[in-house]
Amino acid sequence: MQPLQLSPIEQQEFDRLLESLHPEQKDLIPGSVIGPFLLKFGLPQKILAKIWDYCDQEDKGSLDRNQVYACFRLISQAQRGATLQELDYNKAGDPPILPKQAKDDHHIKRSSSETADFTPFRIPINPDERSEYEKEFRENLRGHEDSARPGCMPSSIAKPILLKSSLHYAVLAQIWNLADSAHVGYLEMYQYVIARHLVAICKQYNLIHLPRSLPADVIESAKSETPAMNTNIEQGVTQPSLVNTEQLSHQQSISSTKSSKLDEISADNNAQSAVDNKYSSPPQTIDPQANIKALITPEDRSNFYQLFSKIDNENKGYIVGGEAVPFFMASHLDSEELARIWDTVDTQDRGYIDKDEFAVAMEIIKLRLSGKSLASILAYDDNPTEPTMQQNLVSDDTNASTAVPVAFTNDNVSNVPLSVADNEPNSTLNLLASSDTAAFEPTAVSLHENPSSSLEDLQSAFQNTSFQDQVSTQNQANTADISQNTESGSSTQGQMFGIPPTTQSIPLKMAGFPGGVNSSLTDIKEEEAVSENAPQQEERSFEQIKTSIHIAPENISAIEESKSVPLPTSFATTIPGSTSAALDDQQTTEAPFEEPDEPAHEPTEEEQEEMRKLEEKIESTKYGLETIQTSGKTIKQRIEQKKTRLMILREELQELDAIKEEAQKQISQSLIADQQLSTQIGSVGMGKKQAVKELRKLQAKIDSIIADSMSPMGTGAVNSPAIKPQVTPAPPTPAPTPAVKHHPPPPPVRSSISPSMPPAPLTHANSSTPMNYVSQPESPPQSYESIQNDNELLQELLSMGFPREKAVIALEATNYDVNEAANILLSSV
């Protein structure tokens, strides 16, 4: 890898990151040191693995300083949205960002977004700039317009355009939240103009924090003269993140008038914040996360971490809004509350949260479901959208506000549902002010000091108030009514203590549970058996009634007229009898418990609907479990089949190995035999060469003989037995007569050895040879059979096409062996 040319900023930041590792060898960092450090940048492990492969091309398992620089560059590009194909370590850019560093800075001080100067974001959009962005909007939308949302650009087109700006994805998430505040996944023309305008501002001023809302004049400057299709950008002040949250859009119902006021309030707050930040230190505010973290129990924290691990299946160390919102939606909280919860934990508007922030969000949701309002949980309201419950109460009766019990003070006033203020007259506060609240202080304190208590704890807190304390305040009817009107009890319980049934009461309902504190547990406890200590509790309760209260005769008739009403959840029976005698009998005799004629609680339509949904969910879960079990069995069968197949393949492999060994042995034997044959062939070749030499010598001899025989002066051929004329004794010639004086010439001598024509004897008269030749002794004549055999051998060679002269010589040389003669003639060809 060639040395990289780093910019001054990159050189400084890369060296700082390397110094934070404290490696033993600064020029060679092992993978065990640099690997865990790279995981802190928040990228998926698959991308980090590819980046490592790009840098460690030699697979050494360690990186030198130049390779670490290249790794930092690639991580920075990946953080800014570059794909794996677009990564290039030769391209300079901004240093990478450590999410952990931003988290540590948040624990030290408030986010810089609270003290940042948002002045550039208050500048209205220039008409020329708006026209340019509108033209760009039309060009990119042409041919891609959705028929369901005409005139709107889908996120699949808008987001790639924004990614070309090379801004960090966290900054782009904030820009998208401000543009598509309703989170419908589409941008209108003016929203696209706002998004492009914010991109230009962030690039020009190098900003990474954006305000949570834009001033109204900036939004208006993004709109052209033509009215927009809708105004969903004004339908929210703060939204969680850059995610597809169409599930939330149908729940938003804030009016445009109300939102415009909020925009003005937000603009004023931003302006005032800028002035305060410029001339003074940042305001000290209460961090809700610190308070809520202290409320999380170790068991809950462990459960929240497990849920976080299931959502973060890639082990990134954080989850984005698209992963968290569907999970948070299961709480059935309002979308505005979920958005507020998200903003509470994502204080830097990064668009993602870690597991600690996720635990805080889950704890807030848990507290919210327990009945506490979001404002009381967070201990302050950053962006109030409507008057608080406390203001409504004070406007009704300012004198009574100081007499409200502890449970309804500033931090807990929102626990009172809206139905209290709407349905009860002003006398309600007077009743609270004039009543003795000592009996209710334990309940109030338990709610205030331990807001994370479970629903069962809340129920027991209301039930632990002794009946003796309630009876001691029987003349204070209003206070008794407060304790008597929990959902588990009935309004007629006050009649037992001599209180008229017409007295108004305040139901202690908790926000989020329409049926009251105990209603959330009613459906669950209806199917459970009666507690074992229920008889003892009722017996003790009646003993307290017997010893602490005297029922007036006029109240007995009221008891007789009243219907059988169930006691609170702790009790399982009603008061038997309707006369004072029956009551006296019940005080002295332990009467058996009787089941009430009417059910203790008739489920409402909403509860029935919820129960139906739960049943459907249970059935769906059962079906899912059955499907999983079936799939598990199928997978198990496939595994067994694959194991069997693997065993078969192993056996076949062993057989193939045996065949291979046998083939190798045969090949070795064949090679040995081949070598032996080669040796034999070599020896045969040597013999052949020797035979050829001998044949050549013999051929030379034959050629010399033939040459001698063809020479006219040669005598070799004459003396040869093969061509030597046969001399036969001439028949006796008659004696010449004297009368004959001239003899005719003799016939010519034939050189044939044919027995039919024997050669004529040579005489002195007709022979040209010397006389001594004639007088030489002649060889004995051959037999007729021998001559006949020699002629047959000669004819056989002649039939093979050999010349006659050479055939005769070859027969002579081989002693008339026709095979040897043929070989000699063939070698001489």
From Swiss-Prot:
Q: Which UniProt keywords apply?
A: Coiled coil, Phosphoprotein, Repeat
Q: Which residues carry this modification: Phosphoserine?
A: 112-113
Chain ranges of the UBA domain: 788-828
Biased-composition ranges, Pro residues, are 728-737
Residue ranges, compositional bias (Low complexity): 775-785
Q: Which GO terms describe its biological process?
A: actin cortical patch assembly; endocytosis; endosomal transport; intracellular protein transport
Asked if the record carries the keyword tRNA-binding, the reply is no
Q: Which Pfam families match?
A: EH, UBA
Question: Entry's SUPFAM superfamilies?
Answer: EF-hand, UBA-like
Boundaries of each EH domain copy?
Answer: 10-109, 129-225, 300-398
A cellular-component GO term for this protein = cytoplasm
- According to the record, the residues making up region (Disordered) are 93-121, 466-520, 574-614, 724-785
Superkingdom of the source species = Eukaryota
Compositionally biased intervals (Polar residues): 466-506, 574-590, 764-774
| Ranges for domain EF-hand | 43-78, 333-368
Can you tell me which residues the record assigns to a coiled coil?
602-709
The protein's GO terms of the molecular function aspect are: calcium ion binding; polyubiquitin modification-dependent protein binding
- Residue ranges spanning the membrane: these are none
Q: Which SMART domains match?
A: EH (SM00027), UBA (SM00165)
PANTHER family xrefs: EH DOMAIN, UBA DOMAIN-CONTAINING PROTEIN 8
Specify the protein name.
UBA domain-containing protein 8
This chain's source organism reads Schizosaccharomyces pombe (strain 972 / ATCC 24843)
